[in-house]
């Protein structure tokens, strides 16, 4: 029986590690367009001021904390149009 419990220790350790790593990673997003021109302004257009703007491989990269569960404005608009279509069809 001791051997069976010791075989479960390694998978449990990996599960804990992966759970912690996912929580501590920030969210990155590329803004594709022209070469890195006005990256800070581009990031501020879509994200809060807590994001950091960098140029990476000729693209703007917005780095910062992950947003909460609320969808971004772009996705809220898409979802609201789907709701309108569903209301029209029903």
Curated annotation (Swiss-Prot):
Signal peptide location: 1-23
Keyword Secreted (UniProt): yes
GO annotations of cellular component type: extracellular region
Disulfide bond entries: 27-66, 36-55, 39-60, 43-62
Subcellular location: Secreted
Record key words, sorted: Antimicrobial, Disulfide bond, Fungicide, Plant defense, Secreted, Signal
A GO BP annotation: killing of cells of another organism
Primary localization class, coarse: secreted
Family: Belongs to the DEFL family.
Name of protein: Defensin-like protein 178
């Amino acid at each position: 029986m001791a051997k069976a419990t010791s075989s479960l220790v390694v998978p449990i350790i990996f599960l804990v590690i992966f759970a912690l790593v996912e929580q501590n990673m920030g969210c990155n997003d590329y803004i594709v367009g022209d070469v890195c021109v006005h990256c800070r302004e581009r990031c501020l257009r879509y994200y809060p001021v807590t994001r950091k703007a960098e140029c990476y491989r000729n693209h703007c990269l917005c780095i910062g904390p992950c947003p909460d569960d609320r969808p971004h404005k772009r996705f809220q608009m898409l979802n609201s149009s789907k709701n309108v279509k569903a209301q029209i069809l029903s």
